């Protein structure tokens, strides 16, 4: 069995973290009762959180350590961060690529010695970090890591992107062990699996996973929207991890000729002064609850007049999460546009979806290549 592996992807939001979740869960199950240890590392991180003692680490390292109970130290799991302004500092000579690589090398050495298998997760596509002479392929070559690459489900454009990423790996002498397709159209699974596998044969690289798209994994939560819009929940805080199957910008009046249809799992965006819309949402939620159902609605309000305490209490009583965004931050149209373009990462506190992602990956991937 190989002892360490780098998880790459052809781009951002393709599925590195999702795949890593499934891989960690698979290996933890395999190691259970054996005394073997599993380790995780994000050699180069970008989004980061404070973990105490003045230390900040990559969000993914935080998620993996806390969710899976990994025992290694944070400083090794996230040795290098690229915060805002870091690239300029590098070009100004405040830090060198040798210093950065030394930090990664020490962290890898520690984790490798402390574990029976080490999963390293890359950042973005294979070339990310090149401006600091620290891209994923260079890191893999330095640490003598083989790689597995995640690509988006599809054929032509997906394979084109894979080819570019593979070329960078080849230039650095990194072996690509396998390819995993993510977010594949369920209706095209068999066709894509067949043709992609045949296309990969020219490189003698196996397709080791074909993961169908699961919308529940990519839908942002109310907590994600609150962070995106730099606002806070004014109600329904216990439903902060609620996510939605549709979004509605409510502009038309609600009256006898224009009823506000009750749609489950819908996020509504409207003006804070639209009492007719807000009352209709609350009324629909209460009517559904009398029949033992929960519409699981969500609400984003904008406008110069913040929602009253009374309204927040009414929304809270029906557990409807609501965010108020003042117009100096964004109007209804801007909010709708931001939401439609937003892709959220799985949150550490969203245990249900972490487990869902791990199980989904494990079900559709064959990790037996690790035993070679």
What function would you assign to each model-found segment?
Residues 1-372:
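Flexible phosphate-sensing "switch/lid" loops adjacent to ATP/NTP-binding sites
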């Amino acid at each position: 069995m190989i002892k360490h592996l780098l998880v790459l992807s052809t781009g951002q939001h393709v599925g590195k973290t999702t795949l890593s979740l499934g891989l960690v869960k698979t290996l933890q199950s395999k190691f259970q009762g054996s005394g073997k240890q599993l380790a995780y590392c994000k050699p180069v991180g970008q989004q980061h959180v404070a973990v105490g003692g003045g230390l900040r680490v990559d969000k993914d390292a935080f998620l993996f350590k806390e969710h899976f109970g990994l025992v290694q130290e944070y400083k090794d799991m996230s040795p290098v961060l690229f915060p805002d302004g870091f690239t300029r500092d590098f070009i100004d000579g405040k830090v060198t690529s040798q210093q950065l690589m030394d930090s990664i090398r020490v962290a890898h050495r520690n984790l490798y010695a402390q574990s029976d298998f080490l999963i390293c997760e890359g950042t973005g596509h294979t070339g990310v970090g090149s401006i600091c002479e620290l891209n994923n392929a260079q890191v893999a070559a330095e640490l003598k890591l083989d790689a597995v690459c995640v690509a988006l489900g599809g054929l032509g454009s997906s394979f084109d992107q894979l080819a570019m990423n593979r070329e960078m790996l080849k230039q650095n002498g990194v072996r690509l062990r396998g390819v995993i397709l993510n977010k594949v159209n369920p209706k095209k699974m068999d066709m894509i699996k067949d043709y992609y596998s045949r296309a990969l044969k020219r490189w003698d690289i196996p397709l080791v996973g074909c993961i169908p798209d699961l919308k529940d994994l990519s839908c942002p939560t109310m907590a994600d929207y609150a962070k995106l819009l730099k606002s806070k929940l004014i109600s329904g805080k216990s439903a902060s991890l609620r996510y939605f199957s549709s979004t509605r910008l409510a502009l038309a009046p609600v009256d006898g000729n224009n009823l506000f249809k009750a749609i489950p799992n819908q996020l509504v965006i409207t003006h804070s002064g639209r009492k007719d819309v807000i009352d209709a949402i609350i009324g629909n939620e209460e009517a559904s609850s009398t029949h033992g159902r929960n519409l699981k609605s969500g609400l984003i309000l904008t406008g110069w007049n913040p929602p009253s305490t009374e309204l927040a209490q009414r929304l809270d009583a029906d557990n409807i999460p609501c965010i108020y965004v003042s117009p100096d931050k964004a109007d209804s149209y801007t909010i709708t546009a931001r939401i439609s373009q937003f892709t959220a990462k799985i949150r550490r506190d969203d245990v249900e979806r972490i487990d869902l992602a791990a199980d989904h990956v494990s079900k559709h991937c064959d990790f037996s290549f690790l035993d070679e």
